[in-house]
Amino acid sequence: MRTSQYLLSTLKETPADAVVISHQLLLRAGMIRRLASGLYTWLPMGLRVLRKVETVVREEMNAAGALEVLMPAVQPAELWQESGRWEQYGPELLRLKDRHEREFCVGPTHEEVITDLARNELNSYKQLPINFYQIQTKFRDEIRPRFGLMRGREFIMKDAYSFHLNQESLQATYDGMYQAYSKIFTRLGLDFRPVQADNGSIGGSGSHEFHVLANSGEDDIVFSDSSDYAANIEKAEAVPRESARGAASEDMRLVDTPDTKTIAALVDGFGLPIEKTIKTLVVHGAEEGTLVALIVRGDHELNEIKAANQPLVASPLVFASEAEIRAAIGAGPGSLGPVNLPIACIVDRSVALMSDFAAGANIEDKHYFGVNWERDLPLPEVADLRNVVEGDPSPDGKGTLVIKRGIEVGHIFQLGTKYSEAMKLSVLSEQGKPVNLIMGCYGIGVSRVVAAAIEQNHDERGILWPSALAPFQIALVPLKYETESVRQATDRLYAELTAAGFEVLLDDRDKKTSPGVKFADMELLGIPHRIVVSDRGLNEGVLEYKGRRDSESQNLPIGELMSFITEKLSR
């Protein structure tokens, strides 16, 4: 492809509204343009990258036995009403009416549509298991779209849905999708981690997220430094570093603590080690009208997902108001603790191993110091309630935990029968009895992968595409293309490279565009290999080569270039 016949829309300046590096570089490289809040047009250069992601995804899904379909983006309200999600889904669901006043939505996801398809097309166990997928545009009406493709309102997603008679069949397909996703992100050249995840409101028995590691990631992911254990921060099990509770060495005493409403004030005002303090948080109980106290160590953070999964606690998690707390306990936040606590209490595992600790006395402006379990009060229910911290023991007993930032680009779920029961999807079993099908769902944010790849692969000059994603493999840059010898040599080399199957962008812009601008544009675009043709080089029988990740260029004999490039691109 010649730049004279292509849309090369690079920008020198970074648009003011672009915050994250992927958004900045996608705009500067002329790969996308903003149409409206959270809506982007893909320009030819960016579309080449997007199509490469789609190709790898499609190849691996096909290899895993999934069948491609294409479902409508606009969906009838009746299906969502049938599943119960029409009322449950928030304002992110874009609803509309047609000229006949029938209600529809623009699909943020396709569980209802695929379940409707399955109940109309599947009628026998002999058709199972089966796995459908599509690559389709989705829409979620985010209140504050931001970060370009990372959190837009319209996005491109690969979503797959599988149907099974039993859990064993689902597990086999789920494992196959796990392997397919691992192959996809490996082929795309991304540094990623699959992590255990919480199913949340989706339900089901298994879930994994796939995260691209990047400092700009929105999510904390946790993995062992010595094993394959990995989980997101919501799911990671927090194992105490202490193996046993220390012996009591202080008597419990009541201490006046005026104006001490925070852990920081307690530590600073009384010289206490933070690991000898606790935080008491009060939430609504599962039984209507009840409250439950959740206690974590002062230097730890409550994991709200783990808390909401406790049988005594209401889900979703609702924190009690100060008025509710005072009415139930007689003291306000900052003075709460487990001693003489009149409501149910759950303590974190690390709290259960504490000795000689400080806790609110449930009396305004007073704390107990030197508190010890079993001696001063019975040990209440113990559960894993906190977020892990770096250096915690790995739950599998191998090594310690490392925490890094990640960008979620894929998620696989074992859905169970949530949709098949709600929408009456069943087939006849081998015994001739109707059986509700068990479902799995598997998503990849195709357009988000493009942004995540840039977040992980860039430098001060622009994008550093992994080779599988680069819009072109080779940038061919002639100096003084108007010179006959340079033009002939460049055109000949361009013909040879394209005939060999390489994707080449020939920068044939005229002499008004300086070599420096050409080089800067090719680096901004992230094209992995650059070849420079010049009069001087031709006179010396060489071409200049520079890899995008190289610090220095090198001269290659003209006759060796094809074998050199072929070897480079075969790695």
Curated annotation (Swiss-Prot):
Subcellular location: Cytoplasm
InterPro entries (alphabetical): aa-tRNA-synt_IIb, aa-tRNA-synth_II, aa-tRNA-synth_II/BPL/LPL, Anticodon-bd, Anticodon-bd_dom_sf, Pro-tRNA-ligase_IIa, Pro-tRNA-synth_IIa_bac-type, Pro-tRNA-Synthase_IIa_type1
UniProt entry keywords in alphabetical sequence: Aminoacyl-tRNA synthetase, ATP-binding, Cytoplasm, Ligase, Nucleotide-binding, Protein biosynthesis
Reactions it catalyzes: tRNA(Pro) + L-proline + ATP = L-prolyl-tRNA(Pro) + AMP + diphosphate
GO molecular function, one term: proline-tRNA ligase activity
Keyword Ligase (UniProt): yes
Top-rank lineage group of the source organism: Bacteria
GO cellular component, one term: cytosol
Keyword ATP-binding set for record: yes
Record GO biological process: prolyl-tRNA aminoacylation
EC numbers for this chain: 6.1.1.15
First-listed, main subcellular location of the protein, grouped into a coarse class: cytoplasm
Any Pfam family hit: tRNA_edit
Enzyme class, broadest EC rank: ligase
Domain notes: Consists of three domains: the N-terminal catalytic domain, the editing domain and the C-terminal anticodon-binding domain.
Function of the protein: Catalyzes the attachment of proline to tRNA(Pro) in a two-step reaction: proline is first activated by ATP to form Pro-AMP and then transferred to the acceptor end of tRNA(Pro). As ProRS can inadvertently accommodate and process non-cognate amino acids such as alanine and cysteine, to avoid such errors it has two additional distinct editing activities against alanine. One activity is designated as 'pretransfer' editing and involves the tRNA(Pro)-independent hydrolysis of activated Ala-AMP.
Subunit note: Homodimer.
Similarity annotation: Belongs to the class-II aminoacyl-tRNA synthetase family. ProS type 1 subfamily.
Protein name: Proline--tRNA ligase
